[in-house]
Structure formats: C-alpha cells, structure tokens
C-alpha cells in the first residue's frame, strides 16, 4: 500500500507522517517513508539527523545507477522504519516532480520499491503544479493534514482537486482528513459538510508533539522516558489501524474557491449561527495572525 500525505506548509505533515510510520511498523508492517521536500527533513524525527538525499547521491555517482547500493540511500530509522529523502532541484530551477520520479526509478532499480508493505510519501506544502502532485501517481490513498484554520482548509481543498484529477487515470482515493494542533473543529466540520469526506482523526494542541520535532524523536521514542505520553501515541495507532483497514476511500469534489471563501467567511461573520464562537477569537478562527 502506498500513501501520500499532503497539507499546508508548516501544518505538521512530517511530524505526523513519522509517527504514523512508526505506528504502522508497530502493527507489524514493513514501512518506508519517502520525504519529498528540498529541505530533506521529513525523516528527521525517525533518524535524528538529516540523511543524504537521492539527488545528492545520484550526483555524486554521476547518475550511474549501477554504482548505487540500497544502503547508500535507504537509512534505518526508529522502530525499524526505513527512510529515504528525495531532496529537490536547486532553488529557482528544476522540478520537484522530476526528483520524485528519479527517486522511484532508483528504488525500482534497487528492487526496493516493491519490498515494503507500506510506502508513505511525505510531500511538501500545497499542490500548485503537476510536479508537486507527482507522488499521487504512485499512491493508493491520500491523507490530508489540516487544522481548524482557513488557510489549511483552503490548501486541503486545492489538494482535493488534485486527487480528483489524478483519480481519472490512477486508482487513487482520499482516505480522509487528519486534523492537527486544533482545539476546535467547527471549520473542519463546516468544510466536510459542504465537501463530504472522512475525518480520520483530530489531534488536539499537544505541546509535546512540537517538542518531539525539535528533539528529533517520535512520540513513540519519547514514551520510553515519559510514559505519560502514551495517550498521544494512541492517536497515531488509531490512524494506522484505519489505514490498514483499507478503507473504501472517496474521489472528492472540491469546492470552488469563491464558494469556499464565502462558506468559511459566513461562519466568521456570524459566529453564533455558524459555530457559536465569540467574535474576539476571529483571528484564530480563520487561521490569520494579527499584525
């Protein structure tokens, strides 16, 4: 099974992806996580360091695939999760989609692409072009990470459009949304009411999740010396269980941009009728920052 994880930049995709990967491994799956971001920090909390990228390795070998061994590009992370970082083209040049394609090509050359029960693609930011959407060409399911803010849901809606487009030619389905770092879900509920899709899980604001990223550890590793965090791991184990159940998934129909803006703005301007929130919370409601 191949899963592509998308969401607004900075929403917590990599931290969530790493914890889901470990949760899947805890359920007995052989897991490979592929980071698809030029920052090549997707697997940082699994390995504790920035591993060499596929592109760096290919360049060092002058793109001679026959000179590359699996251990050159596949690194062992916490919990037995294997890790790969695709890397990216130089800033302002090249295409991220090409890099993803080269990564998959190399893994196939190494007979590694089909050796895993689960391959999880952790993909940068919003989908703004076909290059960023390239991992969807290989995925069975897409999982969208969001929060209860306007910007994150707007990005989720754009990703939804890409899923629908790719599903025309690939057996791709949306597994659902995962809410991250949110104490409320009124905007999420409003969105899925207008654009029906499953909500896999909603994680509350938990400071230890952010701290784990800085420490370069997954929550599962931190539980070893902080047993009180076990309840956080249960969120990720629940997500893993839903993925392993091979949900039917859906091909979603995105909401037109102006309609989505109007939908969420109505909740913002009419908080009592739209969700019962006080007007003095409006910055957080829309995900904007007061300057």
UniProtKB/Swiss-Prot annotation:
Q: What class of enzyme is it?
A: oxidoreductase
Which species expresses this protein natively? Answer: Pinus thunbergii (Japanese black pine)
What does the similarity note say?
A: Belongs to the NifH/BchL/ChlL family.
Q: What is its EC number?
A: 1.3.7.7
Describe its assembly. Homodimer. Protochlorophyllide reductase is composed of three subunits; ChlL, ChlN and ChlB.
Q: What is the cofactor note?
A: Binds 1 [4Fe-4S] cluster per dimer.
Q: Which NCBIfam families match?
A: DPOR_bchL
Q: Name one GO biological process term.
A: photosynthesis, dark reaction
- This one is known as Light-independent protochlorophyllide reductase iron-sulfur ATP-binding protein
Its UniProt pathway annotation is:
Porphyrin-containing compound metabolism; chlorophyll biosynthesis (light-independent)
Q: Does DNA-binding show up as a keyword for this record?
A: no
């Amino acid at each position: 099974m191949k899963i592509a994880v998308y969401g607004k930049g900075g929403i917590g995709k990599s931290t969530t992806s790493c914890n889901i990967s470990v949760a899947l491994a805890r359920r007995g799956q052989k897991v490979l996580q592929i980071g698809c971001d030029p920052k090549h920090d997707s697997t940082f909390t699994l390995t504790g360091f920035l591993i060499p990228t596929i592109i760096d390795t290919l360049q060092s070998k002058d793109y001679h695939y026959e000179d590359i061994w699996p251990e050159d590009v596949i690194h062992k992370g916490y919990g037995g999760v294997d890790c790969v970082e695709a890397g990216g083209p130089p800033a302002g040049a090249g295409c991220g989609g090409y890099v993803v394609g080269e990564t998959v090509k190399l893994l196939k050359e190494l007979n590694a692409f089909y050796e895993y029960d689960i391959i999880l693609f952790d993909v940068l930011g919003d989908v703004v072009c076909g290059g960023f959407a390239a991992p969807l060409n290989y995925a069975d399911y897409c999982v969208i990470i969001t929060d209860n803010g306007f910007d994150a849901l707007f990005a989720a809606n754009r990703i939804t459009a890409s899923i629908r487009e790719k599903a025309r030619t690939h057996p791709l389905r949306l597994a659902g949304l995962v809410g991250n770092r949110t104490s409320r879900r009124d905007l999420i509920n409003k969105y899925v009411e207008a654009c029906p899709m499953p909500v896999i899980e909603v994680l509350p604001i938990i400071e230890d999740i952010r701290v784990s990223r800085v420490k370069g550890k997954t929550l599962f590793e931190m539980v070893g010396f902080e047993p009180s965090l076990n309840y956080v791991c249960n969120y990720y184990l629940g997500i893993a269980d839903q993925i392993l159940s091979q949900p039917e998934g859906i091909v979603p129909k995105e909401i037109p941009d102006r309609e989505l803006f109007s939908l969420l703005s109505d909740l913002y301007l009419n908080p009592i009728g739209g969700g019962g929130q006080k007007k003095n919370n409006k910055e957080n409601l829309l995900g904007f920052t007061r300057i």
